[in-house]
Amino acid sequence: VYHVPNIHPTTVAPLLDHRRNVNTLYANGHGRMVAPPPRIDEKQDAESTRDVGARAEIATVGEIARTCIQSYGIFPNWVSQLTEFVLAPLLFWPNGIAKCRLECWTIAPDWGDGEGPDYWTVNNGERLCDILLEDTEFGTQIQRSMESPGFKGVPLSYQEARIYHWNQNADQMIGFDRIPAELAVRQVIGEDWVHTNDPRVNEMTEQ
């Protein structure tokens, strides 16, 4: 999420504090990110929900989704926001080398006779919303950088944990004997990081 201030300065940054995000890794490549809204002052946070036209609440949604930005990754190709108003999956379908089809969904309670909510597009699919336009344009630049002869890899940190966890599980599913060594990722995230385990909990207890 550290790309938010640079790529989404006016769209996402007002809703999300990228410095306070928490990753949860689940078995089989699934994951979740939770990030609170930015602090207005020592006692108050900003709002974390943007208006996408949804008015009927999902009554069973808990406190975290009502107060923070949540993003769930369901292996292998589902990423979705979850708020008290909508479930908004993005589905990624690889359809060639360096190509991918992006499918956008907005799932919400019955909105009656009015116009339905739309989390990812404008005018019922006329174009992508500004957030997705920013992401997709940024993704093209990342792909070009990775294909450059000068690209030798990047150091990874906690921020990329969910992505790396996904890649580890993709290799496990494909089979290590079917992947050229130079294309496989090192299996460095162990079970001690997979929910319900988390080494940081013990560290906090010890402190």
Where is each model-derived feature located?
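C-terminal catalytic domain of Rieske-type non-heme iron oxygenases
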Residues: V1-Q207
